[in-house]
Amino acid sequence: MRKVHLFLVLVHFIYISTSRSDSISERDILLQFKGSISDDPYNSLASWVSDGDLCNSFNGITCNPQGFVDKIVLWNTSLAGTLAPGLSNLKFIRVLNLFGNRFTGNLPLDYFKLQTLWTINVSSNALSGPIPEFISELSSLRFLDLSKNGFTGEIPVSLFKFCDKTKFVSLAHNNIFGSIPASIVNCNNLVGFDFSYNNLKGVLPPRICDIPVLEYISVRNNLLSGDVSEEIQKCQRLILVDLGSNLFHGLAPFAVLTFKNITYFNVSWNRFGGEIGEIVDCSESLEFLDASSNELTGRIPTGVMGCKSLKLLDLESNKLNGSIPGSIGKMESLSVIRLGNNSIDGVIPRDIGSLEFLQVLNLHNLNLIGEVPEDISNCRVLLELDVSGNDLEGKISKKLLNLTNIKILDLHRNRLNGSIPPELGNLSKVQFLDLSQNSLSGPIPSSLGSLNTLTHFNVSYNNLSGVIPPVPMIQAFGSSAFSNNPFLCGDPLVTPCNSRGAAAKSRNSDALSISVIIVIIAAAVILFGVCIVLALNLRARKRRKDEEILTVETTPLASSIDSSGVIIGKLVLFSKNLPSKYEDWEAGTKALLDKENIIGMGSIGSVYRASFEGGVSIAVKKLETLGRIRNQEEFEQEIGRLGGLQHPNLSSFQGYYFSSTMQLILSEFVPNGSLYDNLHLRIFPGTSSSYGNTDLNWHRRFQIALGTAKALSFLHNDCKPAILHLNVKSTNILLDERYEAKLSDYGLEKFLPVMDSFGLTKKFHNAVGYIAPELAQQSLRASEKCDVYSYGVVLLELVTGRKPVESPSENQVLILRDYVRDLLETGSASDCFDRRLREFEENELIQVMKLGLLCTSENPLKRPSMAEVVQVLESIRNGFGS
């Protein structure tokens, strides 16, 4: 018995000695890991010292009862460096959590030894390369998170080889392509997976709902397709399903809304159609319902109003009709309602005012009538109220001014009347205020000058009168924000306040006495008589010497002269370098009758080259359509605001001409033609090339891409309000003598042909390959991201030398974006390159190609801004883009 006791003591001693020995060894392993760290900005590893207590003093380290490293948790510490292979010698580690750092490279192959690992979380780092296949050998793994890195390639089929214990997998926010392996259905204990924000194609794996405990499915922002309604409805345990921003079609799986545990349901930005259908017994757990940007039809089912816990309801941009259910006011938890861009009619339910937690109410572009209910003023935490594009009438209720937290107030394009309440100036947090295209009258309250947070302001197209308040904050929005108010005057309008009786219309003006009125009338009669005499004298002189009295506001175009020979057109020049004599314009404008001087034909008219003595040339666009422009004043307002814009990559406006029979836009002549001509013209002038301009090397193409991006960034960010192009294409990118880009036709969106019921007019057809999906679908919420999409197509043109849409054969159509994406996903990126290119860095072309694909993402939210595009291009050129 004594021998047995001694034996046990000896074994215990040996075990303790071994533990201490291994513990010392693990300390060295961790110190080696520390040595591989190139930057530790928060000194997170300062406690990792050679004489420190591994289990008690090493920050982020947890040991098991035996003294071995059990967990490494160093999250959000911004550590930089590579992952040390030596960690593979930690024999008992279960958790490796390095979330929120800056590690580069890939997971070392040696990590296949970590058979005890339960958790790998390296999310939000800068790791790259393919997803390591050895992960499939880690049979104890429960939790795998590789999200928000730069992993590429396909998901290894073997990843789900030994996944009996796996509960959660996230590969979100990477550059993964290919399909979702069908083997994922073998993971019987998988609770959820997140593959969102990648480039995955194909369908959801069949029998995905055979996984008995599946609760979370997120595949947002991919290229997945197919009909999912029947399969998804079998996942009875679902808590979250996010299928947003894909290409799914058929019926949306709305039956999921009745599942007991469902809290989050997103099927937005797909191609789902049909009716929502009646929702019986909506889940009391449901908080988020987003089915926006699909092709849903029918009415909003009243069953949706039974979702008592719902916080967000977004059915925007569908084809829904009927009215807004009055019972929506009983959904007491709602904080966001978005129903805009549908065919919904009726009135705005008053009971919406009982939603005390409502923050966003967006009902734009519907067919609503009646008034904006005063009850909405009870929604005291409301941040956004957008009821634009309806048929609402009545006055702007002063009670709405109780919405002191409001940031977006958009009432434009309705039939509102009355005056602008001065109390609007109390909305100190408002950033977006649009009252345009109504029937508002009276003066603009000076109190609006106190709105210091405004980034958008517009009161155009009303019946406002009086003097625009001389407040820089208001005047900074330019004349377009005040245009088409017949009795409004003062800066920034060109209408002085001593003309047209504008100032006299102000309600703030003092009442005039009868005697003063009599004096004014008498003076006016005398002045009128003097004007008549002067006019007669001027007319007589004009007949004697017509050519001597021509000013820069008249021009003798043949089509604009009436039967008496009187010139009736108006010419305005923005440039002092252009000739202003009668003879010069008479000779120069004869080119408009000569087809040999046509240098381009676009969506809104033909472009001619007009030349003058002394070698001066300008481009003259002869408009064939005025789009949404209704009269001369509106024409001059639109062109006038563009005359002062100056940027090295913009083709500057030189002036305009307007008559009842002809409208011209004068702009800078750029000698090397358009980018389209240089890329695609079969016989390019001045070269021996049979296809395009061989002088357009990659260096020049890159500079064209960068210059165009800078021009668009200027229009979007430096112009107040922002100027949208909405017609970006290679024919509107001109090249000067040094092949620098000059963007033309900017700010002319109102002149574009109006979209018809089939999408686009025939004249606009040649731009179809450039049009963003939301614009082609006639979404009235055009944004800067529409220009980003078109610009992305131009990037792909520059890299490939191909047109946006080509027909290689009679029954075949090649869409450039899809063509490039397919080749990139199959690892054949170099097959996309324009074969005429020589002396280029392959990686640079690939980076630009990827940027083009990012810019042409289906979802506008996934596209970068033009300012970000400029930064990316500059980093690519400086060698940091790879």
Swiss-Prot record:
Positions carrying Phosphotyrosine: Y770
Main location: membrane
InterPro entries the record matches: Kinase-like_dom_sf, Leu-rich_rpt, Leu-rich_rpt_typical-subtyp, LRR_dom_sf, LRR_N_plant-typ, Plant_LRR-RLKs, Prot_kinase_dom, Ser-Thr/Tyr_kinase_cat_dom
Binding site for ATP: I599, G600, M601, G602, S603, I604, G605, S606, V607, K621
Ranges in the topological domain labelled Cytoplasmic: 537-882
Superkingdom of origin organism: Eukaryota
Keywords from the named record: ATP-binding, Cell membrane, Glycoprotein, Kinase, Leucine-rich repeat, Membrane, Nucleotide-binding, Phosphoprotein, Receptor, Repeat, Serine/threonine-protein kinase, Signal, Transferase, Transmembrane, Transmembrane helix
Extracellular side: 22-515
Annotated catalysed reactions: L-seryl-[protein] + ATP = O-phospho-L-seryl-[protein] + ADP + H(+); L-threonyl-[protein] + ATP = O-phospho-L-threonyl-[protein] + ADP + H(+)
Similarity comment: family membership: Belongs to the protein kinase superfamily. Ser/Thr protein kinase family.
Official protein name in the record: Probable LRR receptor-like serine/threonine-protein kinase At1g12460
Organism: Arabidopsis thaliana (Mouse-ear cress)
